UniProtKB/Swiss-Prot annotation:
Belongs to the UPF0102 family. SUPFAM superfamilies: Restriction endonuclease-like. This is UPF0102 protein YraN. GO terms for molecular function: nucleic acid binding. InterPro entries: Restrct_endonuc-II-like (IPR011335), tRNA_endonuc-like_dom_sf (IPR011856), UPF0102_YraN-like (IPR003509). It comes from the Bacteria.
């Protein structure tokens, strides 16, 4: 598990949206430092939203960013439920269609970047359209 730099818990002073935006920006920077290329953020389609869309080589990566102050109740990664996965898959399918693609024609994966306290966990290929 990677450590994130200590900056205090800024989420206490921010609105839920501001805190979410801050964690998504941190996730983007962290993923870019690992070699992924930014494509889009906060992509909304009917029925859902994708936090980040990145490119890892030729693979389109749909990223769900989660933050929890502590690991109590399972931590950040545990909050990506089957229902949330279904919404992400649906949203990605719609986004790909707008790009003239599909799961059959574009190499894709779904990652979860989980911030729990000061720890980062990167779950590559956390789920897929066959789950």
């Amino acid at each position: 598990m990677a450590q994130i730099p200590a900056r205090g818990d800024c989420s206490r002073q921010l609105t839920r949206k501001q805190a979410g935006d801050a964690w998504e920006a941190a996730a983007r920077r962290w993923l870019e430092s690992k070699g992924l290329r930014f494509i889009a953020a906060n992509v909304r389609e009917r029925g859902g939203e994708i936090d980040l869309i990145m490119r890892d080589g030729k693979t389109t990566v749909f990223v769900e960013v989660r933050y929890r102050r502590s690991g109590l109740y399972g931590g950040a990664a545990a909050s990506v439920t089957h229902s949330k996965q279904h919404k992400l898959l649906h949203t990605a399918r719609l986004w790909l269609a707008r790009q003239n693609g599909s799961f059959d024609t574009v190499d894709c994966r779904f990652d979860v970047l989980a911030f729990t306290g000061n720890e980062i966990e990167w779950f590559r290929d956390a789920f897929n359209d066959h789950s």
